[in-house]
Amino acid sequence: MRESLRKAGQRVTVGFDGQAASADVKRLVRDYGAASVILFARNVDAPEQVAELVRELQALARDAGHELPLLVAVDQEGGRVARLRAPWTEWPPLRALGRLGSA
């Protein structure tokens, strides 16, 4: 693959439907060097499922020659936007932390 495509891919965050990595997201990580994956409610079920999903994606990136691990993000703002709910630790919304004025 052309180096320019891999460099572009390193700046891309990809998402996907379902609780298993889709063929498209695997191709983007493997063939185009996508360096970041974001998870939404549609991707998460239980801690064990998410851990296995992340392990699979990290192994795919490693096997594809990524120099660094994937950055895996979750759309988790706290409050109403909380993709990881119990049994995960639930944090207050960031605006509540901001109101403390200690930042």
Identify the residue ranges that each predicted region occupies:
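Short, acidic/polar
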Residues: D17-R30
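Boundary/entry segment of secreted carbohydrate-active catalytic domains
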Residues: M1-A20
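Enzymes and membrane/adaptor proteins characterized by extended Gly/Ser/Thr/Asp/Glu-rich
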Residues: L28-A103
